[in-house]
Amino acid sequence: MKSVTLSLLQSAANAFDFGGPVLCDAHHYGEGHINDTFVVWREDHSKRFILQRINTDTFTNPVGLMENVCGVTRHLRAKILAEGGDPARETLNVIPTLSGSTCYLDADGGAWRAYDFVEDTICLQQVGSETDFRTVAETLGKFQNQLKDYPASTLHETIARFHDTPNRYANFEKALAADALGRAKNITSEIEFIHAREQDCHVLLDQLAAGEIPLRVTHNDTKINNVLIDAATGKGICVIDLDTVMPGLAAYDFGDSIRTGANDCAEDEPDQSKVHFDLHLYEVFAKGYLSTAGASMSMAEKKSLAWGARLMTLECGIRFLTDYLEGDHYFHIARPDHNLDRARTQFTLVRQMEEVFDQMLEIVCPDNH
């Protein structure tokens, strides 16, 4: 996609019903890898909004994606109201275009959408305290619980086979066979690591196929920075980045949070000696998550959560390494070998999880381990 200029941004902003003219700043907002995110505000500075260009290379059906987002947020608003909450803060609120559409298509084929800005909130890039991590866990568990009766059949699949780990493995094998940039020679140990875990990739989908765990409506990208936390009270407010809300497994959402939160390093830490999986933080998160989502989960589903942590971390590493082999087209990179560093960090975490996996199972399912 072409870069976003101030004139392009202003043109997109003018298409939305912000209640009056808005001012734009062409500096990107936030830490997201995929979409282009900006903050705009009314000329009188009375209100801010998020304006975002959807990455249509990744999300090829932006209209369908926005149907998902609008349907899910409408459902969440009803739940939040019924629980006595504040739907203006506790879920995303979509701003329509002036013509009443959920997104705006620009002259270059770019797709734009807008949300109310949720003020006085923060999102964590790394876990700052156990309390913060438990708050994230409780918020994500509540989100899943609020969606337990959402009609999954109405959802568009925004990214086909997104958490299909065997398919991610197959895509890696294709990229390895093609070796388009001649990079495979640099990563022999990483290749061996993935090959040794081919069977692990099938564990969760085999459990689903056997009817041991249920298909749910899940977020599918529950990095800790996708939860907004009230800056004053420290309470969890809102789950954001709903682009990948689709039918999925509870293990996916649980696992991705552990992947990003239960360690003391950045996702792209180049020094592997600094990468440490924190079993205690895993336990903190598990207890928080199960406190809000666990009542409707079977023993088998709770047990699958530990596998989710392990497989989402493995899968993410496979994705980073696949992108490295293919030329770094999917994830934004800031330096050479950025995706390789990301992959190595994931694989280090997987190794460490494997060493304490019995304890991980015991924590999520103490009565049936």
Show which residues each predicted segment covers.
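ATP-dependent phospho-/nucleotidyl transfer catalytic cores
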Residues: H27-E31, Q52-R53, F59-V63, V118-R134, ...
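Active-site activation/catalytic loop segments of kinase-like enzymes and analogous catalytic loops
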Residues: A251-G294, L311-Y330
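Small/polar glycine-rich anion-binding or flexible loop at a beta-alpha turn
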Residues: K302-M312
